[in-house]
Amino acid sequence: GLDENGELDGRFYDNAMDPLYESIKAPDREELKEMMLEACKELNRYGVTSSQTDDYCVYRSIPYSEVNEAYKELEAEGKLTVRVYEQCNFTEPEQLRQFLADGNMTGKGTDHFKIGPLKLLGDGALGGRTAYLSKGYADDPDNHGFPLFSKETMQALVSCANAAGMQIATHAIGDACLDMVLDCYENALKEHPRTDHRHGIVHCQASRADQLERIEKMNLHVYAQSIFLDYDNHIVEQRLGKELASTSYNWKTLKDHGVSVSNGTDCPVELPDALAGMQCAVTRTSLHDHVGPYLPEQAFSVKEALDSYTIESAKGS
């Protein structure tokens, strides 16, 4: 990051953090298992018994096979108290091709540890103004944020996974990033048509009406995080402007048009507290100072909020 004088200020954003992560000493398998058990314990404390997680990107120096084996050993030892659907995070097509060549595929595994989708992180976040927007930030017009992939690399990853029969889940917070993801999905499905692909958009926050229609048309899954309204109620119009904000976080519209919309907490960004997320889904306000409601017509009923954490999450996994 840069300060107001254009000097480096010591902040690292998104991919720029990779060298720092790579310098962290890699844990051995027993240490990995201890971390997993601590995570299970914390999730159980909130009543959570199943999760979707992208562990491969935590320690870049550890091969994915070590993560998988650690989970399998915990399951064999009877210690895995959370069902894990592994979202497989890769950044290079060759990594994914090798993963598939090694015999991995969405659905492979057991009820306690199962390979899930290819996971891609398409852009950053609204808070730090790193989500990729088409028209720039309303409070910083020259800043559009940025994508974390070139269009070519994202397309190569999406096409490879789709052709192999793998599910895909892509983080997209800004509308320009969402354009990229929808284009890549559309191209891949034209090349290799599939019916029950369950490809999805993770977060799906800043969006335009035309994009909501494309999501419905492609029968995509949306992995929403209603808990984000707790913070974003304070900044959404400031960041996006009134026009884009009016069609963003439109999860009720998507649901009413037949799109499967699940809910999660994005832990560790937020606490794994499903009840807090349900509260935000129903009230569309922040939790404690009750800012909002933001687009109250997008509120879920209590049953819809509960379903989003249970039935709809099962559809996404």
Question: Language-model segments: what does each one mean?
Answer:
Residues 74-79, 103-113, 190-194, 215-219:
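Acidic (Asp/Glu)-rich catalytic clusters
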Residues 1-101, 120, 125-177, 197-198, ...:
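Divalent metal-binding segments
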Residues 110-130, 218-230:
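Non-cysteine beta-strand/loop elements that form the S-adenosyl-L-methionine
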